[in-house]
Amino acid sequence: EFRRVLFRSFIDAAKKLQAKGVKEISVVSETITTHEYESKTLAKAFEEITGIKVKHDLIQEGDVVEKLQTSMQSGKSIYDGWISDSDLIGTHYRYGKILPLSDYMAGKGKEWTNPGLDLKDFIGTSFTTAPDKKLYQLPDQQFANLYWFRADLFARKDLQDKFKAKFG
């Protein structure tokens, strides 16, 4: 009974989807431990709770990027959902082919969005938000980014002047 109450919105949404003929959804992600867990454990739990099967393809990162770009260029997606690194947010935003998640959750996806979902519970939404201030995906897994640069080159006045002349 606890499970039923806890997952009420998933169960209710699943019933509506099943009434529309949805029996399976397909998603793709790169092959890393986090996504292997999602594929093996969370997909199974989702099916047990909702009755909707999740087909979760695990492929190499480069293949995810290639398939995603092909889908954006063609306007046809072979997957219902994509789990991609947050550093692709710029690509999602620039192509203009991805519906921002924040727009979807507030608009036509509102009936499918768990009313208990609080985006403040997620760490890293700044990494999955584009320059238009819209959220394009929920942060799934994050890793520290470290950028190296040569301070001696940045300190050179001649290079600073060239940069300023070119870029303002």
Task: Give a label for each model feature.
Residues 6, 126-128:
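Short beta-strand element of the conserved SAM-dependent methyltransferase core
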Residues 19-21, 74-77, 92-94, 128-133, ...:
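Extracellular/periplasmic catalytic domains that process cell-envelope and extracellular macromolecules
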Residues 95-98, 102, 119, 135:
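Generic secondary-structure boundary/loop-capping signal
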Residues 102-107, 129-168:
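Helix-loop-helix "hinge/cap" segment bordering the ligand-binding cleft or interdomain interface
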